[in-house]
Structures are given as structure tokens and as C-alpha cells.
Curated annotation (Swiss-Prot):
NDH-1 shuttles electrons from NADH, via FMN and iron-sulfur (Fe-S) centers, to quinones in the respiratory chain. The immediate electron acceptor for the enzyme in this species is believed to be ubiquinone. Couples the redox reaction to proton translocation (for every two electrons transferred, four hydrogen ions are translocated across the cytoplasmic membrane), and thus conserves the redox energy in a proton gradient. The keyword RNA-binding does not apply. Its EC number is 7.1.1.-. InterPro entries: NADH_DH_suC, NADH_quin_OxRdtase_su_C/D-like, NADH_UbQ_OxRdtase_30kDa_su, NADH_UbQ_OxRdtase_CS. This is NADH-quinone oxidoreductase subunit C. GO terms for cellular component: plasma membrane. It comes from Cereibacter sphaeroides (strain ATCC 17023 / DSM 158 / JCM 6121 / CCUG 31486 / LMG 2827 / NBRC 12203 / NCIMB 8253 / ATH 2.4.1.) (Rhodobacter sphaeroides). NDH-1 is composed of 14 different subunits. Subunits NuoB, C, D, E, F, and G constitute the peripheral sector of the complex. The keyword Methyltransferase does not apply. It holds the Pfam family Complex1_30kDa. Belongs to the complex I 30 kDa subunit family. PROSITE patterns: COMPLEX1_30K (PS00542).
Length: 200
């Protein structure tokens, strides 16, 4: 399988040299680093080229790296049922940079791009209806950004007296504390009181 993915990477780089910055094969999937302003043409090529035929858009997401000048990675996942292969396209964009929508090539990108906009605040130019999809219309901020406060900005609750949903600023009964526990996946090297199973 890695040989087939390396051949695919070589084919794409040969046919779309201006769109690809680099590639790697990890965990049985090919990742292409893409020039942001070439994304639409590359996606069209991956869909229509006979050696590719990546006709299924699986997901679009983003990764926040606040310490980098190009803060976000926008990541596209595609599937070729004809070639039985997956491909990941990854591009770095600045916070003030827009990304071209691939809605014209994959109409299902509509929902994924709206989600990325809602969660990260990344704007997609050429999108037919770029508005929030998971949070309320008046929601402040973008909750998947690493600088978004854990408590949020607004508390939403049903008020029994007013018989409606009310929005209020978050009021913490005690100062917010950040706990630094051991990872639950690494497991503890001590026995908790009352944990009889650990002693047997």
C-alpha cells in the first residue's frame, strides 16, 4: 500500500506541481501539503483524473496552532472508492486569510465549511450560505480556537419565571481553577481508597 500511495503522490505532483508543497505517507494515508490559493483546482483534478477519482469528500476540519504565524491548518479528507484509497489535503492559513470554497466541486462541502467557520472563524470565499451551523446566531467567538475560554462567555438557561430561554454572562461561584492531573490513559500507580478490585 505505501508504494501505491507514493506512486499517487508522484502522479499528483507531476500533474499539479504548482499546488503541492510536499507530501508524506503516515498511518496508511497520503497527506499532501497544499498551496492555499490552488485548493479548488487541485480538488477538481483529484475528482476527475482517472488515476485518482477521489469523488467522496469525507470531512473538512481545522487545527489551531496559535503560536504560528499561519495559525490554522485546514484539512480535507477524500475517499476514492474506485482506487480504494484515502487522501488528506492540508494547508496552512493565517487568521486574517480567507480560503476558497470547494462547494462548486463537492456540494457537500457546504456543511463542512459552515462548521469550520462556526468553530474556528475561518472564512470561505464563494460559499453560498456561510453562517453558523452548530452555535446560536448571536454566539460570541469560535469555541474550537485554543484561546476560547473553557467557561465560554454566555450562560444559556431556561428561566421558569419568564418562561423563556435567557442569556446571561457567565458567573462562576468560585474562581476558575485549572487542575493538572495525570493522564487517565496512563493510569495511576497508586490504589484509591475503597478500590477493592485493585487489591485482588
Amino acid at each position: 500500500m505505501p508504494e501505491a500511495l507514493q506512486e499517487l503522490a508522484a502522479h499528483v505532483r507531476m500533474r499539479q506541481p504548482d499546488a503541492i508543497l510536499g507530501h508524506r505517507v503516515e498511518f496508511g494515508e497520503l497527506t499532501l501539503d497544499v498551496v492555499p490559493n490552488r485548493i479548488v483546482g487541485l480538488v477538481e483534478f483529484l475528482r476527475s483524473d482517472a488515476s485518482c477519482r477521489f469523488s467522496s469528500l469525507v470531512d473538512i476540519t481545522a487545527i489551531d496552532h496559535p503560536e504560528r504565524p499561519a495559525r490554522f491548518d485546514v484539512v480535507y479528507h477524500f475517499l476514492s472508492m474506485y482506487q480504494n484509497q484515502r487522501i488528506r489535503l492540508k494547508m496552512q492559513v493565517r487568521e486574517d486569510e480567507t480560503v476558497a470554497s470547494i462547494h462548486s466541486v463537492h456540494p457537500s462541502a457546504n456543511w463542512f465549511e459552515r462548521e469550520v467557520f462556526d468553530m474556528f472563524g475561518i472564512l470561505f470565499t464563494g460559499h453560498p450560505d456561510l453562517r453558523r451551523i452548530l452555535t446560536d446566531y448571536g454566539f460570541r467567538g469560535h469555541p474550537m480556537r485554543k484561546d476560547f475560554p473553557t467557561t465560554g462567555y454566555t450562560e444559556v438557561r431556561y428561566d421558569e419565571v419568564q418562561k423563556r430561554v435567557v442569556y446571561e454572562p457567565v458567573k462562576l461561584v468560585q474562581e476558575y481553577r485549572q487542575f493538572d492531573f495525570l493522564s487517565p490513559w496512563e493510569g495511576a500507580d497508586y490504589i484509591l481508597p475503597g478500590d477493592d478490585k485493585a487489591r485482588t
